A protein has these predicted regions:
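A cross-family signal for N-terminal binding/gating loops and helix N-caps
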Residues: 1-147
Length: 147
């Protein structure tokens, strides 16, 4: 498997707690809206952009992806998300109770994924994969640690 550093977009440290959010697929639209209420810097406005549209909006409609792009651009223009000065590898740590796990975020080669050298995230659903792929294509960025 081949990995490489990449020049990511990161929140400015003072706003990082406001940008951070739960994974898009652990909350429904109403829960995402409640979590993002009063938090204009929350990445939920990108990952679950339907929360800023009328309630009857299809979460897979063009309007949602357009809104996600507009919100993502706004976070960059407003200085909430800034580009790293050079390529980086990102180490992270997650804790739940006594369990701690660490990971690495890096660029990789699609060919390695296609050759099954990269383990696929467990229990993925085709509709969710298609949604995240469309969001990544729309943003020209991946806003989640697992894709």
């Amino acid at each position: 498997m081949r990995i490489h550093p990449f020049q990511g977009l990161v929140p400015v440290p003072a706003l990082a707690p406001e940008v951070a959010c739960v994974p898009y697929d652990v909350v429904n639209t109403a829960e995402a809206a409640a979590l993002a209420a009063g938090r204009p810097h929350s990445l939920l406005h990108v990952d679950r952009a339907e929360i800023g549209l009328p309630p009857a909006t299809d979460p897979y409609s063009d309007a949602v992806y357009s809104r996600a792009r507009a919100n993502f651009d706004s976070l960059q223009r407003g200085g909430t998300l800034v580009r790293e000065t050079g390529p980086c590898l990102y180490v992270y740590q997650q804790r739940m109770g006594d369990h701690v796990q660490r990971g690495l975020v890096a660029g990789c080669h699609v060919e390695d994924y296609d050759a099954e050298l990269i383990k696929k995230h467990e229990k993925t659903r085709k509709d969710k994969e298609d949604d995240r792929t469309r969001l990544i294509d729309t943003l020209s960025a991946d806003t989640g640690p697992v894709s």
